[in-house]
From Swiss-Prot:
Gene3D superfamilies to which the protein is assigned, alphabetical: 3.30.70.330
Transmembrane segments: none
GO cellular component, one term: U12-type spliceosomal complex
Protein species of origin: Homo sapiens
Disulfide bridge positions per record: none
The organism's place on the tree of life at top rank: Eukaryota
Entry annotated with the keyword Nucleotide-binding: no
Matches recorded under SMART domains: RRM (SM00360)
UniProt-listed Pfam families: RRM_1 (PF00076)
Gene transcribed to yield this protein: RBM41
Biased composition range(s): Polar residues: 223-235
Protein name: RNA-binding protein 41
């Protein structure tokens, strides 16, 4: 029987012995214990440091039982918040004080003086702010060195072809964000570019003045400054000719003013998309006369009122927008006159609007054409706006008529 030699021959390759982290730590402890060259001063200078004790509170006990998803998410968020406060080194009492301070709860039991509680809260806030500051600091790996971009390029050129990749991995550079100078004109480059484009378009519209327009669309834009007046005149073709042909003139400026739910002016809106005019023959086919409007029970006492330059629109559909009003009334915009103002009401006055024309003659023409038009399924009812004097006279007249009626009833009885 042959004997098997288990010895490794000298010419065979010996595998490299791998050392684990645990073995390395044990070896360093053994060397530290067997080292006799240390002095008493070195031993006394070393201080014992222990890791602080932590509290483990299982999350399963609080989450046990039946609960909804929102309740579980709320409970989980509270648990994470408590864990983050424990990481700051706060004890249970300080955590309870901070939570009651954040939630605004006031306990009726005996507590410490307000000054002591305020000092504790201030200390907790300082810890939280310090932790946030540390987390915001730029982080880097251990045994690494930060270089500038130029220094990094030099290192790469020097070690090109050398076997020092591990050393290069320890070097890094970080691009710092460029700080913008407030006085730098390059910061306003985008806004300047937009202004130049708009100026070029204005010049193109001015060149087209007096020529037949290629498109039947309406381009409505608001150029209202802080004073509420338009900066540029409107560009309109003759409204009578093109409206009769069913073509929409091209409007350049039209004020579109919206009101917030508190009925306060929030500034002008800009309509820059093409808007087509509603042809006049279509308006005439889909509108009611004043007699037909009075047959509706809601508007049985309909009266347009005394003519003036403000039109009051009511019974508007919720789907009506400024674009719809512009497509109906912008045909009355004069070529060199002031722009027509559109005011849409919201909140309690939703479904109503005011349109201001340059004069009452144009307003009367607009009312005569558009009144009773069926817009988005509802009849558009238009009246002339009433000023404060007309309102007071109307209220006085109604009070007198009511008093006369009551007197007649008493005398008749």
């Amino acid at each position: 029987m042959k004997r098997v030699n288990s010895c490794v021959k000298s010419d065979e390759h010996v595998l490299e012995e791998l050392e684990t982290e645990g073995e390395r730590q044990l070896k360093s402890l053994l060397q530290h214990q067997l080292d006799t060259s240390v002095s008493i001063e070195e031993c006394m200078s070393k201080k014992e440091s222990f890791a602080p004790g932590t509290m483990y509170k299982p999350f399963g006990k609080e989450a046990a039982g039946t609960m909804t998803l929102s309740q579980f998410q709320t409970l989980h968020e509270k648990d994470q918040e408590t864990a983050s406060l424990r990481e700051l080194g706060l004890n249970e009492t300080e955590i309870l004080i901070w939570k009651s301070h954040v939630s605004g709860e006031k306990k009726t039991k005996l507590r410490a003086t307000p000054e002591a509680i305020q000092n504790r809260l201030q200390d907790i806030e300082e810890r939280i702010s310090e932790r946030q500051r540390i987390l915001c600091l730029p982080q880097r790996f251990a045994k690494s060195k930060q270089l500038t971009r130029r220094e990094m390029e030099i290192e790469k050129s020097l070690f090109q072809g050398a076997d020092r990749h591990s050393f290069l991995k320890a070097l890094y550079y970080q691009d710092e964000p460029q700080k913008k100078n407030k006085g730098d004109p390059m910061n306003n480059l985008e806004s300047f570019y937009q202004e130049m484009i708009m100026k070029k378009r204005l010049e193109e519209f001015q060149l087209m003045r007096g020529e037949p327009f290629a498109s039947h669309s309406l381009v409505s834009a608001t150029s209202v400054g802080d004073s509420g007046t338009a900066e540029s005149p409107s560009l309109l073709q003759d409204k009578g000719k093109q409206a009769a042909q069913g073509k929409g003139p091209s409007l350049h400026v039209a004020n579109v003013i919206d009101f917030s739910p508190e009925q306060c002016w929030t500034g002008p809106k800009k309509l820059t998309q093409p808007i087509e005019f509603v042809p006049e023959d279509e308006i005439q086919r889909n509108r009611l006369s004043e007699e037909e409007i009075r047959k509706i029970p809601m508007f049985s006492s309909y009266n347009p009122g005394e003519p003036n330059k403000v039109l009051y629109l009511k019974n508007l559909s919720p789907r009506v927008t400024e674009r719809d009003l512009v497509s109906l009334f912008a045909r009355f915009q004069e070529k060199k006159g002031p722009p027509i103002q559109f005011r849409m009401m919201t909140g309690r006055m939703r479904g109503q609007a005011f349109i201001t024309f340059p004069n009452k003659e144009i307003a009367w023409q607009a009312l005569h054409l558009v009144n009773g038009y069926k817009l988005h399924g509802k009849i558009l009812v238009i009246e002339f706006g009433k000023n404060k004097k007309q309102r007071s006279n109307l209220q006085a007249t109604s009070l007198i008529s009511c008093a006369t009626g009551s007197t007649t009833e008493i005398s008749g009885s």
